[in-house]
């Protein structure tokens, strides 16, 4: 039986919010069959930005990254589904939107390395999804619910023989 309850952290970055792309980005994840279990429209402060991007602290682009991510509101989310972390990364596309394949979120909407619209937990960094979820959400902000469509997304949940 496939595990359908992997959770991952996703965020529409300030450029995506300013460009009115929250809805389109949410739609991409919903139509893939993933299930939203948390969402928060918020402004990231300096301290949270430093924690969230701690792995990039020593990179030359770090200060610019912090100033970008705190420059306007973001839409932070938690999504659930089979292989959710890697599935979201595939939908996002390559980090540099100029290299991201058409059909991906960054490939279709972006044209820049820094302004690349969406963050998703790194599936190659063990536990990054859980760490990032805990950084942005309290347990009681996450909603357990059954998505009826899941039975039509995952064959092993179906009623038919
Ligand atoms: P990811 O968002 O695809 O996981 P990371 O390597 O984790 O990519 O980098 C985090 C974010 O930092 C990227 O999404 C991008 O906005 C920004 N970034 C990464 N590399 C550079 C760079 O070389 N110059 C400027 N910004 C960068
Ligand atoms: Mg990353």
From Swiss-Prot:
<keyword id="KW-0963">Cytoplasm</keyword>
<dbReference type="GO" id="GO:0005737">
    <property type="term" value="C:cytoplasm"/>
</dbReference>
<keyword id="KW-0808">Transferase</keyword>
<keyword id="KW-0067">ATP-binding</keyword>
<dbReference type="GO" id="GO:0046872">
    <property type="term" value="F:metal ion binding"/>
</dbReference>
<dbReference type="GO" id="GO:0006183">
    <property type="term" value="P:GTP biosynthetic process"/>
</dbReference>
<dbReference type="GO" id="GO:0006228">
    <property type="term" value="P:UTP biosynthetic process"/>
</dbReference>
<keyword id="KW-0597">Phosphoprotein</keyword>
<feature type="active site" description="Pros-phosphohistidine intermediate">
    <location>
        <position position="119"/>
    </location>
</feature>
<feature type="binding site">
    <location>
        <position position="13"/>
    </location>
    <ligand>
        <name>ATP</name>
    </ligand>
</feature>
<feature type="binding site">
    <location>
        <position position="89"/>
    </location>
    <ligand>
        <name>ATP</name>
    </ligand>
</feature>
<keyword id="KW-0547">Nucleotide-binding</keyword>
<dbReference type="InterPro" id="IPR001564">
    <property type="entry name" value="Nucleoside_diP_kinase"/>
</dbReference>
<feature type="binding site">
    <location>
        <position position="61"/>
    </location>
    <ligand>
        <name>ATP</name>
    </ligand>
</feature>
<dbReference type="GO" id="GO:0004550">
    <property type="term" value="F:nucleoside diphosphate kinase activity"/>
</dbReference>
<keyword id="KW-0418">Kinase</keyword>
<feature type="binding site">
    <location>
        <position position="116"/>
    </location>
    <ligand>
        <name>ATP</name>
    </ligand>
</feature>
<keyword id="KW-0479">Metal-binding</keyword>
<dbReference type="InterPro" id="IPR034907">
    <property type="entry name" value="NDK-like_dom"/>
</dbReference>
<dbReference type="Pfam" id="PF00334">
    <property type="entry name" value="NDK"/>
</dbReference>
<protein>
    <recommendedName>
        <fullName>Nucleoside diphosphate kinase</fullName>
        <ecNumber>2.7.4.6</ecNumber>
    </recommendedName>
</protein>
<dbReference type="InterPro" id="IPR036850">
    <property type="entry name" value="NDK-like_dom_sf"/>
</dbReference>
<keyword id="KW-0460">Magnesium</keyword>
<keyword id="KW-0546">Nucleotide metabolism</keyword>
<dbReference type="GO" id="GO:0006241">
    <property type="term" value="P:CTP biosynthetic process"/>
</dbReference>
<feature type="binding site">
    <location>
        <position position="95"/>
    </location>
    <ligand>
        <name>ATP</name>
    </ligand>
</feature>
<comment type="similarity">
    <text>Belongs to the NDK family.</text>
</comment>
<comment type="function">
    <text>Major role in the synthesis of nucleoside triphosphates other than ATP. The ATP gamma phosphate is transferred to the NDP beta phosphate via a ping-pong mechanism, using a phosphorylated active-site intermediate.</text>
</comment>
<dbReference type="GO" id="GO:0005524">
    <property type="term" value="F:ATP binding"/>
</dbReference>
<feature type="binding site">
    <location>
        <position position="106"/>
    </location>
    <ligand>
        <name>ATP</name>
    </ligand>
</feature>
């Amino acid at each position: 039986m496939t595990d359908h309850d992997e959770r991952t952290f996703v965020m529409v970055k300030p450029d995506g919010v300013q460009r009115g792309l929250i809805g389109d980005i949410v739609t991409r994840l919903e139509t893939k069959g993933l299930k939203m279990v948390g969402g928060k429209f918020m402004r990231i402060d300096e301290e949270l930005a430093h924690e969230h991007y701690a792995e990039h602290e020593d990179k030359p682009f770090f200060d610019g990254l912090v100033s970008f991510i705190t420059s306007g509101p973001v839409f932070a989310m938690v999504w659930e589904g089979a292989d959710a972390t890697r599935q979201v990364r595939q939908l996002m596309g390559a980090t540099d939107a100029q290299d991201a394949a058409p059909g991906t979120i960054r490939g279709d909407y972006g044209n820049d390395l820094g302004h690349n619209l969406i963050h998703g937990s790194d599936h190659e960094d063990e536990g990054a999804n859980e760490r990032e979820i805990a950084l942005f959400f309290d347990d009681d902000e996450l909603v357990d619910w059954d998505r009826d469509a899941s039975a039509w997304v995952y064959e092993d949940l179906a009623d038919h023989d």
